[in-house]
């Protein structure tokens, strides 16, 4: 794998060194997280540090943004090419002591083995983003695999287990192309009580009429949907859209 080194300056003035892979969308992804602040990391209160969770970490954009603001980060990413890049990006900035990586696929339960399939295009984030997502019934997962691409076998981890030894979470970000519905389908009230903010890339399914409201129902109505405040507009339709939920 060939890497190119670059550097971004965040809106809060932090300089972040990065590696990107030739022929991929890594640079654009990192730019949107670090320079454009896609997940609104600058808005978070970091006066007491704290812990954040990055599910679907990809190249590490959100993770690096959070680490640069002084948060400890727990990341989840199953694809080996991505986890290698994330570790390189964390290490080059000297933030390894504040970083934990689960090289697993997010799921409703831990300890299962699932087959993930890579997309053939280098610009694809990863197969697990596509093979889960049309249902919150995990029994249907393996029927949603791509028909082409390379396959790997990985173990799963649940949100409950990720947060087992964590007292509080300032932000939980999730971007896993549909897996959010399964991931949150069995989350305990104990885990949800620990989380202050959730930013999710929601992927509507065929039955979804208002995915923002349905996702808030899924997380137990413990949060206020402030998507319109954070992102200025909402397209309430069965499609992809960022959503922000706050206690």
Language model regions located:
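Phosphate/nucleotide-binding beta-alpha loop and adjacent structural elements of enzyme active sites
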Residues: 1-247
């Amino acid at each position: 794998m060939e890497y190119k080194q670059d550097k971004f300056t965040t809106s809060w003035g932090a300089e972040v060194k990065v590696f990107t892979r030739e022929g991929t969308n890594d640079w654009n992804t990192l730019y949107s997280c670090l320079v454009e602040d896609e997940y609104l990391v600058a808005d978070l209160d970091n006066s007491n540090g704290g812990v954040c969770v990055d599910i679907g970490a990809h190249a590490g954009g959100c993770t690096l943004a959070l680490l640069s603001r002084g948060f400890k980060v727990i990341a989840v990413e199953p694809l080996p090419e991505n986890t290698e890049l994330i570790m390189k990006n964390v290490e080059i900035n000297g933030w390894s002591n504040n970083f934990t990586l689960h090289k697993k696929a997010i799921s409703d339960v831990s300890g299962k083995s699932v087959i993930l399939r890579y997309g053939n295009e280098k610009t694809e984030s990863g197969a697990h983003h596509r093979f889960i997502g049309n249902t919150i019934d995990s029994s249907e997962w393996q029927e949603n695999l791509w028909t082409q691409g390379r396959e790997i076998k990985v173990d799963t981890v649940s949100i409950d287990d990720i947060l087992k030894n964590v007292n509080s979470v300032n932000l939980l970000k999730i971007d896993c192309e549909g897996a959010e519905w399964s991931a949150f389908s069995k989350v305990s009230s104990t885990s949800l009580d620990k989380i202050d903010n959730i930013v999710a890339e929601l992927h509507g399914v065929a039955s979804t009429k208002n995915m923002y409201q349905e996702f808030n129902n899924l997380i137990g109505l413990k949060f206020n949907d402030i998507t319109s405040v954070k992102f200025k507009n909402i397209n309430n339709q069965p499609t992809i859209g960022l959503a922000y939920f706050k206690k």
